[in-house]
Amino acid sequence: MFPLLHFIVLIDVKDFPLTEGSTITPLCQKGYFPCGNLTKCLPRAFHCDGVDDCGNGADEDNCGDTSGWATIFGTVHGNANNVALTQECFLNQYPQPCDCKGTELECINADLRAVPVISSNTTLLSLKKNKIHSLPDKVFTKYTQLKQIFLQHNCITHISRKAFFGLHNLQILYLSHNCITTLRPGVFKDLHQLTWLILDDNPITRISQQLFTGLKSLFFLSMVNNYLEALPKQMCAQMPQLNWMDLEGNGIKYLTNSSFLSCNSLTVLFLPRNQIDFVPEKTFSSLKNLGELDLSSNMIMELPPEIFKDLKLLQKLNLSSNPLLYLHKNQFESLKQLQSLDLERIEIPNINTRMFQPMMNLSHIYFKNFRYCSYAPHVRICMPLTDGISSFEDLLANNILRIFVWVIAFITCFGNLFVIGMRSFIKAENTTHATSIKILCCADCLMGVYLFFIGFFDIKYRGQYQKYALLWMESLQCRLMGFLAMLSTEVSVLLLTYLTLEKFLAIVFPFSNIRPGKWQTMVILICIWIVGFLIAVIPFWKEDYFGNFYGKNGVCFPLYYDQTEDIGSKGYSLGIFLGVNLLAFLIIVFSYTIMFCSIKKTALQTSEVRNPIGREVAVANRFFFIVFSDAICWIPVFVIKILSLFRVEIPGTITSWIVIFFLPVNSALNPILYTLTTSFFKDKLKQLLHKHRRKSIFKTKKKSLSTSIVWTDDSSSLKLGVLNKITLGDSIVKPIS
């Protein structure tokens, strides 16, 4: 194990020389980013981690995702209500519950049931949280100086066509959180100076192009959480200055090529949380000035390859939480100015580096899987920061895993080494079987080595794993560890299957001559190792087909695969675990079941056996624990694989628990089940300890052992009835050591 530690490669900060006096940004290798104007480059994980790794603070600059226009406009809803009021009131007439400052009037929660009579010089009127149910014709006609009206949280159900007649100076109108179901065309036709129109949280189901007649100055339109199912053709035809449109949380089911045909000034378009399932290729072709587009949380399954072709100025794109099945390789080719791309909760089965290369200005990217970050090495900030198996700081997410990885590694490694030593020291009469057990221990010992490495790298990266996570999973060490674990697993599975079949033939068919001899056994063992080696090494041969087969997670074991995997790696993994290993498990369970039935049948037919029930219990217990250890080891793996076929989301931490607690069960228990608890081993050990004091007892036990035919070396575990079954054939079956 310890010579393999020389493969450890420490991740160092890279320095690149520049000519004297040069002020250009240094060229950094893939996955590294410059420290401002210094000659130093740091890995991506060292940027924006809260630590000044550069020395000049450059790695902690520009960490926030400020692309798009949200920061330019500020928090729209908050700014609209926080109006600076003077202390003196200049209004002559207003209701007593209202608060007047200057020419601005607030009648909040004043139990008003209609628009009150106020002074004509009022410029701001806030009627929030009252009981106004309707706005009749010309209700504001006397208040032509109004610039802002706030009518949120009333229960307005009806607005007359001429309700806002004469409000030529109105700039901001809030009608959110009401009960408006329909708005008549032309209701806003006198609002020539209106810049903000907020209609959030109303049960509006339908709108027409004519609804917005007169809104020639409208800059911001918000219809969040309405019940819209469709948009009118050329929605912006009456709003030539519209810059920001927010339609989040509606029921819009489709878009057309003409939906935004006249929205030439639009810079921000929000369409998240709708039911859009398809977007035509020319939908956004007229949005030449669009800077931010949000299509998240819809039902889009496919995007045309050139849908973003005309969005040359787009800075921020959010496609997260869509059931996209495929992204074209040139999907983002025209987005040269894009700075932020959100693909969270999207599986990308055909992901490749070329997909993101054209976006050279990209500074923030968000994925579903941590490993996707390796396909965008030029992006400074990539999320998520971990693979879900590990925590943000550590390779192993909690103290239980950190402690038991060493405990199980020690038990597995040194338990098997002890058995190898004792088997080599104690002379066995059946040398071929003893050799098979020692070979099994060698394979199981590799699992202990693998766990030691996991524990070692957990200590190495303790407290800073997220900085090294991606580099670690792509490293040669991680791949070699995965190779060791796979080699150990497959050789152990094949050897256990072989030993089970060997035992099966001896017990169920004691008079047959199809059991292998010494040389045949050696050939079988060599073939098992070759097959196991090939299974483990094949993913290295064609990386473009299998991808980083072992580097999918922090523990470097290809256990769980989602739908985003390459067809090669996914099929290969399923073939191994649900093909080879599941078949081997079924063979072992079936064989031990038949063996137990055969022994029980023989015991019932043999009258010489004094205590058949006790011996049946002993055999049943032994066989149960052998099968049970296999079940503990493999059933969780089979369940995970089957669930992955049905696209069931499984927490990443499950992998580390299975790899540390379940997968090594066989490797840890095999020395106990096949050697340490057998009567043969216990008797031999006693004989060695009492060699000089009890020579006579030693000879007696040796003589009794020489008649045993049990292939597990446990002469007391199996029925003496079996001996009666093959009394005439003792010379056919060699005693098992």
Swiss-Prot record:
Query: What keywords were assigned to this record?
Result: Cell membrane, Disulfide bond, G-protein coupled receptor, Glycoprotein, Leucine-rich repeat, Membrane, Receptor, Repeat, Transducer, Transmembrane, Transmembrane helix
Q: Which residues lie on this side of the membrane: Extracellular?
A: 1-399, 460-478, 542-575, 644-653
The residues covered by the LDL-receptor class A domain are 27-64
Membrane-topology descriptor: Multi-pass membrane protein
Subcellular localization(s) per the UniProt record = Cell membrane
Organism of derivation: Canis lupus familiaris (Dog)
- Give one GO term, molecular function aspect: G protein-coupled peptide receptor activity
Q: Which spans of this chain does UniProt mark as LRR repeats?
A: 121-142, 145-166, 169-190, 193-214, 217-238, 241-262, 265-286, 289-310, 313-334, 337-358
What is this protein identified as? Relaxin receptor 2
